[in-house]
């Protein structure tokens, strides 16, 4: 058992990106923040499934070519093998929770970003 406050961790890109509160041994759990106009490279996972829950703002998550516009309170589940691309195309930051399982040290395969 452990506890931690998100302020004890830093976002990967300074003010944005993922902020991992836990990496392994069975799952990853992160708070993710994207500023207006920011995106995250399209990719898929061979083994891990990924879930996002929106805490603040609005975001587009394209899964296998289908655009999903999500806002506060929305949840999306992404299966292994489904290509997903995250973009904040809006005028305010988005903050969301990301949970991936089962934990794999290396399981991200980058692909070309979709045009939408």
Model regions and ranges:
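A short, N-terminal "cap"/entry segment at the start of jelly-roll beta-barrel domains
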Residues: 1-28, 108-116
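Conserved short histidine dyad/triad with adjacent acidic residue
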Residues: 30-45
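Ligand-binding loop in jelly-roll beta-barrel domains
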Residues: 80-106
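Short strand-connecting beta-turns/loops that link adjacent beta-strands
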Residues: 25-27, 47, 91-92
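Histidine-centered metal-chelating micro-motifs
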Residues: 39-41, 60, 76, 80-86
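Well-ordered beta-strand scaffold positions
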Residues: 25-27, 58, 66
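Short acidic-glycine-tyrosine-enriched beta hairpin
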Residues: 65-80
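Glycine- and acidic-residue-biased ligand/ion/polar-headgroup-sensing regions
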Residues: 47-49, 54-59
């Amino acid at each position: 058992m452990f506890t931690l406050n998100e302020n004890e961790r830093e976002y990967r890109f300074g003010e944005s990106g993922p902020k991992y509160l836990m990496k392994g041994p069975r799952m990853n759990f992160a708070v993710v923040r994207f500023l207006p106009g920011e995106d995250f490279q399209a990719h898929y996972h061979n083994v891990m499934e990924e879930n996002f829950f929106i805490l603040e703002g609005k975001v587009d998550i394209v899964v296998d070519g289908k655009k999903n516009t999500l806002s506060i309170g929305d949840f999306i589940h992404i299966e292994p093998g489904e290509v997903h691309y995250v973009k904040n195309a809006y005028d305010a930051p988005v903050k969301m929770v990301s949970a991936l399982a089962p934990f794999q040290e290396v399981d991200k395969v980058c692909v070309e970003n979709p045009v939408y």
